[in-house]
């Protein structure tokens, strides 16, 4: 990869930046590691050079971006001043990018690469996650959040943004976290989070999922099934377990609905009751294979209204993740553990914490959840974005000058 260098770009205008592309050198793995070492020692030019390389779309651009991101994400007493330099550099680049966007210059090269100079700053990227922490304007944070989270369903439409410390988790964030902790689980399975109702219908996503699973596998469910469900601005966790009674040769589905509030509402409760009961009264009666009937006779439904959000009004999604993790981990230790018992014990234990302790538990979970999203789900989205840029623009060059412009 050939790259030209800009240093002290906080003092460059966008026009100067476009007109001073002279000195170039080859980026290598050895160079990146050397720059990382000198950047960690506080060398500002190394930090700025890493940012220039990070603007690229090839593997070195990604590696440089990772170096900066992981320094910021894992602060120590020794790196606090370094992190401030990195954040300042990111914000300066972002401000230059806005200048270029608002007052675009005529491209200077046939590959249109000047226009692409700051493309990564407006695409899903780890640079974007660093920038968002530093941007003071809420509206700009929200715009970046839409890109970073691919928020097509406007889950952040209440004025919150990705960097808010007290906001609801999105569908993708919850799914990413739960899939990670359930990846090697043998006794519990996690299903993709959904809304309660199918749009423009009284039918629920849960009944669709249950119907599809039973049709494809009459012995389903073999493991405990967890369904994160958004009832409309609020997340709950539905647990389904098949109980076998060998004495009378019957099988039963037990359903536990974990709700971190003190109530769910009669309409929503009735909808969920109808979903479970309909397997016996409606769906199973229409199945030609009568052997399936015994799987769902006399279902039992328990609503566990845990009332955990006295101090954490926007943490229903976090509670779904933490409660699901409790079930998954405990059932790996003891597969006979009943979901209701595990969820009840979790809720009772959490209530014993002081308000300060609850805040800290919630805060630490959100950090882990965010990092999980960025490392897994976010990386996939970022890599897809890079791939599209590479295909469309055929390896655009990093543009910058080796001269310090004052």
From Swiss-Prot:
Under the heading Pfam families, the entry gives:
ElaD_SseL-like_N (PF22103), Peptidase_C48 (PF02902)
Q: Which residues cross the membrane?
A: none
Q: Does the keyword Transmembrane apply?
A: no
What does the UniProt keyword field contain?
Answer: Hydrolase, Protease, Thiol protease
- Keyword Transport attributed: no
Coiled-coil annotated residue ranges, if any: none
Biological process according to GO: proteolysis
State the source organism's domain of life: Bacteria
Q: What does this protein do?
A: Protease that can act as an efficient and specific deubiquitinating enzyme in vitro. Does not possess desumoylating and deneddylating activities. The physiological substrate is unknown.
Q: Which family does it belong to?
A: Belongs to the peptidase C79 family.
**Protein name per Swiss-Prot or TrEMBL:** Protease ElaD
Organism, scientific name: Escherichia coli O139:H28 (strain E24377A / ETEC)
Encoding gene, per UniProt annotation: elaD
